[in-house]
Swiss-Prot record:
UniProt key word rRNA processing: yes
Gene source species: Prochlorococcus marinus (strain AS9601)
Entry annotated with the keyword Zinc: no
Domain PRC barrel: 100-176
Protein name: Ribosome maturation factor RimM
Signal peptide: none
Localization, UniProt: Cytoplasm
Amino acid sequence: MIIKNEWLIVGFITSCHGINGQLKVKSLSDFEERFLKPGMRWLQKESEHPSKIELISGFKQPGKEIFIVKFKGINTRNHAEQLKKCKLLVKSDKLPKLKKEEFHLLELIDLEVKTLENDELKIIGKVINLENEKNNLLIIELFKNQKKVLIPFVKEIVPLVDIKNNFLIINPPNGLLEL
């Protein structure tokens, strides 16, 4: 899960690459420079606090959302094995600037959720968090019963996001809100 105003998960270390401490990272980011540009990053093992690590280099595997990265001090396969399943994080206050119509996923948290019923917009809940480990899912708390539901963040189900006016519209398939 992503917690607003703290950390953003941008990738997962999936496995080692070779014998010199390189690692494969599955990207969850649209910004490739997070895996290519040298500098400080943060790694997090399961429920531990994030720790700083320096990215030395990286390159993208052709045709995949996988990057091969090299961190300072990780020089053997044995060292690299210890980092498998770690999350690669960035601080959410260091997010890149976007174009006018674009937004960061973190900006979806706390938006009102509306549906169109009988040609009228009805507020049904709010986005309380995101699930982003495999798919982009909105975690929405419904006002009528405080139930939490997962909504896939795809154009067919979430056709409109209005960050400026603090709401989004969902068009859920029948039964999705009752699960």
